[in-house]
């Protein structure tokens, strides 16, 4: 009998934002797997460190993180093969994923390689837009407002066309795309209420206006939250 593949959402960064179910699985599963840079621990591993019992087998998917490039297929191929070997031996494997596993999550790349071959259980996690709304203490949307969540990596015209159809928006993966996103928000009358959250729920969390972000710069893990109207 093969093991079960778990996609484990570990939340946006604060270790106390893991679900009870995620913590239970972390403490009982014999194998964990997670993406990490070429050197050092990955973010997901750091988030769960305090909850790990020790003695588990750890599969590290080493890869160069470059948001301008496609996902590193070879790294995911190797990682999926290592995970499959553990599952074939009857050992459950929990793949750690920042935020929610199926919302812009790295677990999706493992899942597409192993789905259909093993039992799969996905444990949802708190995604970054929800953590940003909590940090700002403001609703993402209300009543019948249309909410759009879109990555800043889209081209400017596509962003404008998408955001023109909504009353509330979250723009993710901001980083070097700040100037482009600001132009679009100003064109669509969405800039006035915009706030930026970097590293939501982390110790280094920072909340900024567009002007402050343009002056100081923003990391890749930054989001813009805005609404056209308030109610």
Describe each region flagged by the PLM.
Residues 34-35, 60, 95-97, 122-125, ...:
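General beta-strand structural signal in soluble alpha/beta enzymes
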Residues 5, 88, 163-231:
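A contiguous loop/helix-start segment that scaffolds small-molecule binding in enzyme catalytic cores
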Residues 39-41, 66, 127-131, 178-179, ...:
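Short gly/pro/ser/thr-enriched loop/turn and capping motifs at secondary-structure boundaries
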Residues 89, 99-165, 215, 229:
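Class I SAM-dependent methyltransferase SAM-binding "motif I" and its flanking Rossmann-like core
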Residues 21-23, 84, 137, 158-161, ...:
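A generic local secondary-structure boundary/capping motif
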Residues 1-15, 20-118, 207-208, 214, ...:
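Class I S-adenosyl-L-methionine
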Residues 41, 77-80, 153-157, 178:
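Structural motif corresponding to alpha-helix initiation and N-cap regions
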């Amino acid at each position: 009998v093969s093991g079960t593949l778990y996609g484990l959402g570990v939340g946006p960064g604060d270790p106390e934002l893991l679900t009870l179910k995620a913590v239970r699985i972390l403490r009982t599963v014999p194998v964990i797997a997670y993406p990490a840079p070429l050197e050092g621990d990955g973010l997901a591993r750091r988030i769960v460190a305090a909850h790990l019992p020790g003695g588990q087998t750890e599969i590290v998917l080493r890869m160069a993180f470059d948001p301008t490039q496609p996902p590193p297929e070879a790294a995911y191929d190797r990682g999926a093969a290592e995970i499959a070997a553990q599952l074939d031996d009857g050992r459950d494997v929990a793949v750690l994923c920042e935020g929610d596993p199926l919302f812009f999550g790295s677990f999706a790349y493992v899942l597409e390689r192993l789905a259909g071959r093993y039992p799969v259980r996905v444990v949802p996690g708190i995604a970054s837009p929800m953590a940003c709304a909590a940090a700002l203490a403001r609703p993402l949307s209300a009543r019948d407002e249309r909410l759009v969540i879109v990555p800043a990596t889209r081209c400017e015209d596509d962003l404008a066309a998408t955001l023109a159809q909504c009353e509330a928006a979250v723009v993710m993966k901001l980083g070097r795309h700040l100037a482009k996103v600001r132009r679009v928000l100003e064109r669509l009358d969405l800039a006035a209420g915009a706030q930026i959250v970097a590293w939501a729920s982390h110790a280094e969390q920072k909340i900024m206006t567009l002007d402050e972000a343009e002056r100081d710069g923003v990391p890749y893990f930054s989001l813009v939250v805005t609404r056209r109207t308030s109610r």
